[in-house]
Amino acid sequence: MDTRLIAIATFVVTFGILIVLKRLNYIESWDTFSILSILAAVLTIAAYFFTLVLFPQDYDQLKKEILDEINESLKNYEIYFKCKDFKKPIVKDGAVRIDKCVVMATKLNLTDHGYIVDLKFRSNWMDSKGTHAILFIDGDDAQINLFEREGEIFYIIKSKNKISGVYIQLKSVKWFDEAFSDNWNNIKIMWDTSKDEIWLEINGIRVSKKLNFDFNLNDSVIYLGSNPLEDTYAEGYFDRIMVYKSADTADFGTPTVRRFE
C-alpha cells in the first residue's frame, strides 16, 4: 500500500481516538485536545518520512513491472493501428494513435521476400521542448511515448496506478541497411482518409503517385517493401506497398499489393 495512504489513515484513526476520549471526558480541556491533535499530526508526518528512509520504494522493480505489463499487452498488436476519428477518439487497448494519420518507417528488415519495413508509428505531436514524437501507445493502464531528441531515442512510460514519468534512454537505432540510415525521420506514408488515398514521401518530396484502394483503410496493417527479383531491390528502393485488411491482428488475411508508380 502507498506510504502516504498509511500515514493519512494513521492520523485519521488517531484523531478519531482523541475525539472519543474527549467525549468520554478523559480529556477535560479543549486546549489539551488541541495540543494532542497537533502532536499526533507532527508524529504522523515524522513517521511517514522515517518510513520512506527506512523502507525506500523499489522504483526499478516497479519500472520492470510496468514494462512487463506493457510488453504483455502489446504482444497481440504488432503493427496494427486505427486512425484517429476526429469526431471521437478511437483507440484500442495497446493500439497506436496516429494524429493526422501520418506514420513513419524507421526499421528495415531484409527477408527472402524483399525489404519489409516494420512501421514505427509517428505523429505530428511536438512536446514543449520541441522534441518530435515517434510512437505513442495508449492503453488502459499505461502510456508509452517514444521520441527523438538530438539523435538519441527516449521513451517515457506513464502509469495511472504506479509510476508517472519513467524516463529511459534507448540504445541508438540500428538500421538493417545502412543505405537507409540517412532517411531517419524522412520517410512518411501519407494517408488521406477522406479519399482512401495513400502515397510515399521522402524528405518532404512526394515520390509516388496516389494509390487508390477499394476498401476503407481502417483496421489495416501496412507494409512497405521491395521486390527481390527487380534491380531496384539491390539499391534499397521501396517499390511497393502491402495493405493487410483485417480487424484481428492475429489473422492478417490476404494482402492487397499496390506498386508505386
From Swiss-Prot:
Q: Where are the transmembrane segments?
A: 4-21, 33-55
Per the record, membrane topology reads:
Multi-pass membrane protein
The highest taxon in the source lineage is: Archaea
Q: Where is this protein localized, as stated in its record? A: Cell membrane
Broad class of where this protein is predominantly found:
membrane
Its GO CC terms are: plasma membrane
Q: Which UniProt keywords apply?
A: Cell membrane, Membrane, Transmembrane, Transmembrane helix
Protein name from the UniProt record: Uncharacterized protein AF_2291
